């Protein structure tokens, strides 16, 4: 037997609170905790603007493209069942809208200034209310005497979806007769006096399938859940799917698109303020190629998407360098090192420089001249006389960068004098310790390498940006997670992704493991103002397949690696993009 609620797209939408002085045992909660629907002919709570915005968004939203498919479904049903249409007394509707069905009490509870509910077809279900009882301005409101009177209207009228909006007896009849496809349910997280309760939801028939963000309004928190009939719930969900937890399953299935899921995704986006969606709208027209890519599953898009988000939605701030930035806080990227080496392809990167700097860190060096002699200029601007003097390091020799990364990795806690001193056996050799733990205590949760030494920060030419990494061993594979406090998306982050990936490959090899994942956590992520135009160019480039990285398999000691022990194979890339460093 066909489900009428499915054919004619009938839904319920409601908001319920906790009931003051209910008999529910203290501390024992369930889905039935939220059941308070009304009190003394109105809502139990004062106006909740977030819930009202959600209600309006859900019941007003229509999708013209999806409507044609919904109409085809309904027409097919009526043709199959030889349904004869009778349009007598049913008003014609040209504009596509949703239907809202309510009882007499619910209609009367709506403030006059909001009657009838705009951009919706208002239907009142009442055995006593007559058309002549309504004011002339409500001439387009439809009155029906029973639930059965609704179906001739649904068969004839142009509409997108039909929402049952109250009250309790109306909800109950539609639920009892199995005429509800989904329930859009607001949970108002506060207790109020209630004299009307929402009817019990049959949890064998309906299950919660979606839960929104949590909001605050009128001194209470609230969220929105969607109850779906159990037959419509996806039986198999792959938690490893890239879109799991972020996108409704039906959205990305071109062959079996679930229009309800598309709409639900839109409903849950109701509270995204328009001024935030295009915060930096002056840049919007520069991303034609980037926006033309429908599915951005290539792992490089993790990086590119962050840049796009910051350019479009970032906060405009002044910064230490005086250049100014667009910034946001908190991102994560994850790269599968067992499949590829994440060396960005949308611009050519200086691979040799990345490796030389990493080897320099591993040796515990702080002398910038060592890198300059190899024509690696990553630290050049931070070692100048002017830069060191600005850091109040007047006594420091040019290119003496102080107790930065490598010093902390190999000599944490040692007293720093200058770049020429011998620090052998001084301080804590963190790198040696983590390799020892990986080899001998691989399940340890303390395999951490930290460059953030508060005592030494003022002595450093530049306090560390990538400050901490942790390693994880499982099934013969090594993963690394790194936290970066300050993230220069244009210049620094591409190097950091590659550097810590190489570092993970190296440690995996000397510990007789295989590389697994590199996870990159970004704190203050920013785009310098003088990098924006260059990054627009980069975002409109399409990534190529990542290359692979091969290490000399004979190397078993982390300190024995040299530049000749690294081979990057099949690095296909776009041209170099120049950006000035903000120092």
UniProtKB/Swiss-Prot annotation:
Residue sites binding dUMP per the record: 320, 466, 484-488, 496, 526-528
Region (Thymidylate synthase): 298-583
EC number(s) from the headed UniProt entry: 1.5.1.3, 2.1.1.45
A GO term from the CC aspect: cytosol
Gene Ontology biological process terms from the UniProt entry: dTMP biosynthetic process; methylation; one-carbon metabolic process; tetrahydrofolate biosynthetic process
Domain DHFR, first and last residues per copy: 9-229
Catalytic activity: (6S)-5,6,7,8-tetrahydrofolate + NADP(+) = 7,8-dihydrofolate + NADPH + H(+); dUMP + (6R)-5,10-methylene-5,6,7,8-tetrahydrofolate = 7,8-dihydrofolate + dTMP
Chain residues that bind substrate: 51, 165, 171, 186
This protein's UniProt keywords: Methyltransferase, Multifunctional enzyme, NADP, Nucleotide biosynthesis, One-carbon metabolism, Oxidoreductase, Transferase
Functional note: Bifunctional enzyme. Involved in de novo dTMP biosynthesis. Key enzyme in folate metabolism. Catalyzes an essential reaction for de novo glycine and purine synthesis, DNA precursor synthesis, and for the conversion of dUMP to dTMP.
UniProt cross-references to HAMAP family, sorted A to Z: Thymidy_synth_bact (MF_00008)
Family, as annotated: In the N-terminal section; belongs to the dihydrofolate reductase family.
Assembly with partners or alone: Homodimer.
UniProt protein name: Bifunctional dihydrofolate reductase-thymidylate synthase
Protein's organism: Plasmodium chabaudi
């Amino acid at each position: 037997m066909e489900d009428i609620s499915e054919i004619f797209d009938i839904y319920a939408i409601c908001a319920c609170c906790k009931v003051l002085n209910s008999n529910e045992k203290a501390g024992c909660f369930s889905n039935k905790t939220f059941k308070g629907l009304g009190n003394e002919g109105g809502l139990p709570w004062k106006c909740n603007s977030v819930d009202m915005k959600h209600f309006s968004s859900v019941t007003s939203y229509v999708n013209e493209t999806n409507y044609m498919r919904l109409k085809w479904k309904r027409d097919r049903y009526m043709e199959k069942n030889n349904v004869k249409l009778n349009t007598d007394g049913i008003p014609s509707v040209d504009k596509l809208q949703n239907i809202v069905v309510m009882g007499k009490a619910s209609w009367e509870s709506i403030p006059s200034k909001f009657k009838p509910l705009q951009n919706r077809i208002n239907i009142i279900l009442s055995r006593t209310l007559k058309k002549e009882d309504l004011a002339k301005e409500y001439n387009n409101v439809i009155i029906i005497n029973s639930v059965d009177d609704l179906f001739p209207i649904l068969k004839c009228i142009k509409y997108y979806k039909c929402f049952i909006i109250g009250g309790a007896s109306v909800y109950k009849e539609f639920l009892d007769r199995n005429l509800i496809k989904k329930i859009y349910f607001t949970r108002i997280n506060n207790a109020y006096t209630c004299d009307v309760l929402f009817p019990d939801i049959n949890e064998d028939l309906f299950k919660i399938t979606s839960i929104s963000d949590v909001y605050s309004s009128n001194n209470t928190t609230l969220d929105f859940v969607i109850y779906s009939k159990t037959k419509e719930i996806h039986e198999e969900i792959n938690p490893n799917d890239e879109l799991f937890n972020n996108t409704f399953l039906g959205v990305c299935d071109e062959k079996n698109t679930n229009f309800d899921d598309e709409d639900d995704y839109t409903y849950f986006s109701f509270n995204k303020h328009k001024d935030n969606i295009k915060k930096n709208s002056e840049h919007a027209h520069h991303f034609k190629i980037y926006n033309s890519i429908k599915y951005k599953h290539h792992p490089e898009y993790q990086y590119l998407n962050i840049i796009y988000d910051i350019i479009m939605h970032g906060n405009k701030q002044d910064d230490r360098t005086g250049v100014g930035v667009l910034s946001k806080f908190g991102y994560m990227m994850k790269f599968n090192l067992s499949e590829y080496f994440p060396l960005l392809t949308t611009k050519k990167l200086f691979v040799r420089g990345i490796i030389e700097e990493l080897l320099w860190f591993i040796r515990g060096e702080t002398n910038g001249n060592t890198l300059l002699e190899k024509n690696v200029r990553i630290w050049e601007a931070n070692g100048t006389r002017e830069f060191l003097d600005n850091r109040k390091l007047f006594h420091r020799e040019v290119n003496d960068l102080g107790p930065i990364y490598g010093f902390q990795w190999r000599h944490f806690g040692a007293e720093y004098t200058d770049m020429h001193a011998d620090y052998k056996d001084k301080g804590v050799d963190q790198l040696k310790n983590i390799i020892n733990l990986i080899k001998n205590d691989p399940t340890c949760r303390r395999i951490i390498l930290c460059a953030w030494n508060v005592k030494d920060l003022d002595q450093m030419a530049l306090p560390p940006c990538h400050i901490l990494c942790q390693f994880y061993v499982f099934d013969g594979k090594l993963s690394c997670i790194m936290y970066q406090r300050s993230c220069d998306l244009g210049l620094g982050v591409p190097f950091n992704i590659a550097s810590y990936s190489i570092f993970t490959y190296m440690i995996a090899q000397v510990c007789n493991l295989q590389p697994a994942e590199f996870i990159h956590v970004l704190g203050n992520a920013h785009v310098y103002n003088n990098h924006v135009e260059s990054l627009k160019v980069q975002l409109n480039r399409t990534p190529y397949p990542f290359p692979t990285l091969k290490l000399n398999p004979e190397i078993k000691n982390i300190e024995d690696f040299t530049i000749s022990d690294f081979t990057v194979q099949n690095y296909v890339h776009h041209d170099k993009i120049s950006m000035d460093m903000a120092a």
